[in-house]
Amino acid sequence: MQDFQNYILGAWEKGKGTETKLYNAINGELLGGVSSAGIDYEAVLNYGRNVGGPALRKMTFQERGRMLKALAFYLLEKKDAYYNVSAWTGATKIDSWIDIEGGIGNLFANASLRKQFPDLPYYVDGVAAPLSKGGSFIGHHIMVPKEGVAIHINAFNFPIWGMLEKIAVNLMAGVPAIVKPSEYTCYLTEVMVKDIIASKILPEGALQLVCGLGRGIIDHVDARDTVTFTGSAATGKVLKGLPHITDRSVAFNLEADSLNASILGMHATPDTEEFSLFVKECVKEITIKAGQKCTAVRRIIVPENLIDDVQNAISSKLEKTKIGDPAVEGVRMGALASKLQVERVRESVLALEKSQNIVSGDLESFDVEGADKKLGAFFSPILFRNEDPFNNIACHDIEAFGPVSTIMPYKDMGEAIELAKMGKGSLVSSIVTPSNQEARDYVVGAASMHGRILVLNKDCAKESTGHGSPMPLLTHGGPGRAGGGEEMGGKRGVLHYLQRTAIQGHPTTITAITEQFQIGAEMPEANPHVFRKYFEELVVGETVFTHKHTVTDADIVNFANVSGDNFYAHMDATSLDGTIFEQRVAHGYFILSKAAGLFVDPKKGPVLLNYGLDDARFIKPVYPGATIGVRFTVKEKMDQEKRSEDDIAKGIVRFLVDVYDETGETVALATILTMVKKLDQSK
């Protein structure tokens, strides 16, 4: 018998004895045992805080992003081994793809977020707040990595995705993790973590693994730490309410299984493509991962005049679904994760059956391909029908965490929304309809009790990721029964692991802290011109003060002729009554164009190109006779990795373009983005 191990304190260790025996979900074969007994969790937490944390916090967001990208590519090369082990969980190839490659996709997605963060170990949040009349005192916000650990207590259904979707976020933020997968499928998590540790891509202490029961794993958490829990609502609420969690104000994110609903719109009649899409989506959500998904469709809400059509269509497809060993050709649904899960789902089905009828499937009589039904953890797809869902409410309270769903009728969209909300808070719902108005009515009406809503129609179906797939750049979580938590969500998720702190001081001081130029800070004159300097030589705040240009009527006419912009305010002085303008006004885009002519040093140098313009604002009208100049300031610098050995080493520099007139007042502001060559071409 194999003993599955924990990775703690920089070493692989077995726990004392055997807490749990693990079995192959397909054939019942004993795989081994696992234990976390004897682990000193206080030492484990301190190892993450004192070893992994400092190493991650020294890295910039750009470096952490590149680290995640490297890890993603590394794990993709190893994926075949994960598929082999994933089969032990009862998963089909498609199920495993969601878990393995879907999980790795989270690493890629979070790595790409580095473009949204500064080239710093911490994040500068929002814009400065002016706090004084003279401008010598301002406020801002920074967000620094929390100095604790992220403890992730995960469910059995996605041993890889469940880990990677969480650690991708905390690692990007600069926070180490301790992962506790479900003991029942921890063997798959262990295989991947062994590869992660062997790769040495993550700094030591950034990731630890506890494969056993993990009793005591959150006993020593404090305000620096974050606990995330994915699993049953009952267990999650107990953990979240522990006195030391509340007394120490420990951040706790709860993502619980929920009674998600899919709604067939009233316009999606059997002759529409949307009807077929709805049936296909419901069948998929019942059978993929054998229904063991926190986002699976548990309630199928359809117009009362279409309930028979929908029932017959779904039942027909479910009855044709082959159950068994995924290695056998034609098998479309594997096993539940364990015999224990079979018993739990069976109990829930029997409880539901007291108030509604099974119209497809059977608890006892079903065929299994290539395996022994008695040895494996197999379960038949079950479809219930509830004729009176407003009074027979068990379907809104009891979740059978397997291939089980209930179909129910509604009279109008108001009823459909009310039924969806009777789940008391869900991770996701979906509506399938060809009507945009119907979609809008549902989304606006149901959104308050749902974390995500999919609107599906024939126009997006080909590329839709489906009802049950949380996306790394969108939030995952939900109100009420779903736990009230939120994870992933791209940049939003990363911010959960950062502490926001308000800072106050002189603009020059705030510039030094944020490494972003703040209005009112010192502006030392650049010498030589900033376009003559390489990336490493540029200093935030240094400024080019340009020569001046007096705007003429000819400038306005010539720009109108070149651009084709003959808007009346620029060209017809007789049409200005009732406007804010005193006379014909120069084009805002002319002002910025002329500003470029003033601040650009035209000779070939380190500046490779200008690739964008952000935050352009035209603040004050410029009339013929006004004289403009430019304060051209290094606003922010961001390193950029080389894409290949032959690539030019470069960085991104953002310059503030402050155009002012003869009174000294700003007339236009913009930020230009440039690529600037580095002196050191080796990295």
Locate the predicted segments by residue:
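HotDog/MaoC-like acyl-thioester-processing domains
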Residues: 530-540, 618, 622-683
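Catalytic strand-loop segment that frames the active site of acyl-thioester-processing enzymes
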Residues: 526-586, 678
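Short, well-ordered beta-strand elements within core beta-sheets of diverse protein domains
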Residues: 30-37, 52-57, 131, 151-152, ...
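ALDH superfamily catalytic-core signature
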Residues: 195-200, 226, 235-390, 414, ...
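Hydrophobic beta-strand-centered segment that forms part of the acyl-chain substrate-binding groove
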Residues: 577-636
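N-terminal Rossmann-like NAD(P)+-binding subdomain of aldehyde/semialdehyde dehydrogenases
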Residues: 1-135, 320, 337, 448
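Conserved C-terminal structural/oligomerization subdomain of aldehyde/semialdehyde dehydrogenase
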Residues: 26-33, 201-204, 223-224, 316-317, ...
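Rossmann-like NAD(P) dinucleotide-binding subdomain of oxidoreductase/dehydrogenase enzymes
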Residues: 118-277, 410, 463, 485
